[in-house]
Amino acid sequence: MLLIPAIDLKDGRCVRLRQGDLDDVTVFSEDPAAIASNWLAQGARRLHLVDLNGAVAGKPKNEAPIKAILKAVGDDIPVQIGGGIRDLDTIERYLDAGISYVIIGTAAVKNPGFLHDACGAFPGQIIVGLDARDGKIATDGWSKLTRHDVLDLAKKFEDYGCEAIIYTDIGRDGMLSGVNVEATVRLAQHVRIPVYASGGIAGMADIEALCAVEADGVEGAILGRSIYEGALDFKVAQARADELTS
């Protein structure tokens, strides 16, 4: 079970949002690269970056801190990024800069042809981010709820050739209210590619619950507020996950 620390970037700083609300921000650091170095030292095997300004603007907006993070971690661990990725040129620039995986969310839902092209152009490097509330997909930084069913879209995107799916329950994200294991497992059982859980992970009980369903295809989890506020010790959590799923 791969536990992935999240670094959410807004105005060059490392922040966390509650339920995706850009007006409900907690700033954790003015130095995202130092945060990245810390997670590397704690034993992280991958980092998850989100360009929050980019998600709203539809194009990269935190290039300086992203570049600093990539310099800080070097070739030690892969880095994945999402937020505002709407065209193949942006993907290519990120991959050329040293990003290992690019996460496409809103653009995949609004323009499936773009996702199809991206999976063809950059095989093995495209992850789809599906954000949902009550089984329905949300887009545009979670500001718009659609009628798309998460299971139907996941299957369609798997057929396109995406590498994995990050499933975020936006009703729980940033709330430390517990991960939605049932919904995550339902999705993982519906596809053959890896699913990473995100949203609401509050403590070790959630990690253990996810480890129990790894065989269903839940291969990892994105950790945010819990590891920044001390509800979860990342190093201890990854060690426990390794113990349960080795």
Curated annotation (Swiss-Prot):
Cross-referenced CDD domains: HisA
Main location: cytoplasm
Keyword Amino-acid biosynthesis: yes
Enzyme Commission number(s): 5.3.1.16
A GO cellular component entry from the record: cytoplasm
The keyword Isomerase is annotated on this UniProt entry: yes
Any one GO molecular-function label of the UniProt entry: 1-(5-phosphoribosyl)-5-[(5-phosphoribosylamino)methylideneamino]imidazole-4-carboxamide isomerase activity
Catalytic residues (UniProt): 8, 131
Name of this protein: 1-(5-phosphoribosyl)-5-[(5-phosphoribosylamino)methylideneamino] imidazole-4-carboxamide isomerase
Native source organism of the sequence: Bordetella avium (strain 197N)
Primary gene name: hisA
